[in-house]
From Swiss-Prot:
Protein name (Swiss-Prot/TrEMBL): Na(+)-translocating NADH-quinone reductase subunit E
NCBIfam families on file: nqrE (TIGR01940)
Alphabetical list of PANTHER family matching this protein: INTEGRAL MEMBRANE PROTEIN OF SOXR-REDUCING COMPLEX (PTHR30335), NA(+)-TRANSLOCATING NADH-QUINONE REDUCTASE SUBUNIT E (PTHR30335:SF1)
Reactions that this protein is recorded to catalyse: a ubiquinone + n Na(+)(in) + NADH + H(+) = a ubiquinol + n Na(+)(out) + NAD(+)
Main location: membrane
The organism's place on the tree of life at top rank: Bacteria
Keyword Signal: no
UniProt-listed Pfam families: Rnf-Nqr
The family this protein is said to belong to: Belongs to the NqrDE/RnfAE family.
Lineage, top ranks: Bacteria, Pseudomonadati, Pseudomonadota, Gammaproteobacteria, Pasteurellales
Length: 198
């Protein structure tokens, strides 16, 4: 149990997808204007990562890995396309659920919801799972932790962005300029976790 807790904490803080590896920055910067929208997208990323990482772990272990189907047959060259296909299917299902049950959030997320399919944080989580050879339970914990860390980062950035609306930001830095500086400072803060061994 302690191993899984340390893996979760490590994936949220020490190896944060957004602020340590800078993965998923396109949606991270674009949807961080309002806390409510950022929170909704963060929940969507948690759900997709929490399902995509273990689902792809099963596909990799039982289909793609060397000798998984037939001894001596290595289908790992299909990793990239297979993982993207599984992620795309999961995002489509999530999109249909949000459209049916949460239409306001679906409208607020707009084009960024389908872009979760190609969000490199999602694919990065799956790739790290393969590289680190996580088992199924570790994949579930890692997927949920990585999604939680990404959500924590985007909600924190959205909160800071909302507060900066009322501050006197120099004209040349308004918009993405001050956002890049803020993300850099947040990344420096998260870098302080890098020396922690769990």
């Amino acid at each position: 149990m302690e191993h899984y807790l340390s893996l979760f904490v490590k994936s949220v803080f020490i190896e944060n997808m957004a602020l340590s590896f800078f993965l998923g920055m396109c949606t991270f910067l674009a949807v961080s204007k309002k806390v409510s929208t950022a929170f909704g997208l963060g929940i969507a990323v948690i759900v997709v990562l929490g399902i995509a990482v273990p689902a792809n772990q099963l596909v990799y272990t039982h289909v793609l890995k060397d000798g998984a189907l037939v001894e001596g047959v290595d289908l790992s060259f299909l990793n990239f396309i297979t993982f993207i296909g599984v992620i795309a299917a999961l995002v489509q299902i999530l999109e249909m659920i949000l459209d049916k049950f949460f239409p306001a959030l679906y409208s607020a997320l707009g084009i960024f919801l389908p872009l979760i399919t190609v969000n490199c944080a999602i694919f990065g989580g799956v790739s790290f799972m393969v590289q680190r050879e996580y088992n199924f339970t570790e994949s579930v914990v890692y997927g949920l932790g990585a999604g939680t860390g990404w959500m924590l980062a985007i909600v924190a950035l959205a909160g800071l962005t909302e507060k900066m609306k009322y501050s006197d930001v120099p004209a040349g830095l308004r918009g993405l300029g001050i956002t890049f500086i803020t993300v850099g400072l947040m990344a420096l803060g998260f870098m302080s976790f890098s020396g922690i061994q769990l």
